[in-house]
Amino acid sequence: MLIHPEEILETIKMVTNEHLDIRTVTMGINLRGCSHPDIKVFNEQVYTRIMRCAEKLVATTEDIQNLYGIPIINKRISVTPIAIVAEACQEEDLSSVAEALDRAAQETGIDFIGGFSALVQKGMTPGDLSLINSIPQALASTKKVCSSVNVATTKAGINMDAVAKMGHIIKQTAELTRDSNGLGCAKLVVFANAPEDNPFMAGAFHGIGEPDCVINVGVSGPGVVNSAVRALQNPALGDISECIKKTAFKITRMGEMVGREVARRLDAQFGVLDLSLAPTPAVGDSVAAILEAMGLESCGTHGTTAALALLNDAVKKGGAMASSSVGGLSGAFIPVSEDQGMIKAVQRGSLSLDKLEAMTCVCSVGLDMIAVPGDTSPATISAIIADEMAIGMINKKTTAVRVITAPGTKVGDMVEFGGLLGSAPVMPVHNFSSETFIARGGKIPAPIQSLTN
């Protein structure tokens, strides 16, 4: 393929001026062979297995970063859902497993490890229940462990008993991490239709259908897309879509090149490239800024959902043309705390929780990194989760909720997390109760569109 000098300079500009980077290289590790009735033996086998697979992950990614000159921001690990592999232990407290995961993460030098997870869309086994009950203590006693719970699928419906329980778990997690503004909640996500090959945290886990060891890559390029859209001269919306497609193609090619080289050097299988546009707190590296570049005065105003749908579709089309290994979440992320444009939109009053929910209908992944008042009830949190799960179930898409109930905060306060997690303005929730609805429990049946056979 003929490459012009202008294209080389364009790529250099993307990296140096427009925040183009590989957001994450995530190694997925199968832990099914580690199961053991004795939890101490199990923990040691989990630690040993992770160390054996991932001991060179950080060094290898840094070598490739230096080779290509492309920043790789995070190195991560995902493991088989712990609720599955720890079931044989028959222990009620699985927080020691999280500590074993954290020890392996610290010693390998990676940034986060995901997979302290349970899949409970149709019901909870004793192992699932033990894991879910252990989440608050697990996240409070570790630094790098991330947790996720899948409570709904299009095929199974919504497990409302699990949804109700997660409201309490999120509140407990916030309370146990009160000293860090409820930071534990930033490492906990509740899913509908969770993908098994997601490289992004906090929802990454190594699915049952995955190979023994795999490399999945997530790219990040909102700043590049924003610059490309703003450079257009009075474009029609079709022209904007075409511009985003071409930009996404270039971003995806770069990500695949890096991912395949990492996998080759580590003798692991290359899994997927996640096309998600993942913002950072850096100025200009914002999904909201792209929507405003299309002509919206402020993200969240009328037309925002349509603009986001255009963006999400164009990214997928451009990325799918560039790679035959697209997977994970693959869309535009709208995490409030990690996006300067979103934060400003909330502060100026154009972006509400209800509008964010509408936006999740057309992008990935859901209500992400939102802060709500510290006195928000568990039932209200569960109701927010239930709404988002319904969107995912009906539309056959992945949706999720990552909500922080920072203790002691009220509407308008800013909650600081630091690093890539940024800071979040505390947003209002509805004052009317959902308590009776959530307390009914049971299951919301799968929709008619689940009957596809």
Curated annotation (Swiss-Prot):
Xref: InterPro entries: UPF0210
Domain of life: Bacteria
Pfam families linked: DUF711 (PF05167)
Gene3D superfamilies: 3.20.70.20
PANTHER family: UPF0210 PROTEIN MJ1665, UPF0210 PROTEIN SPR0218
Family: Belongs to the UPF0210 family.
Assembly and oligomerization: Homodimer.
Protein name per UniProt: UPF0210 protein Pcar_2119
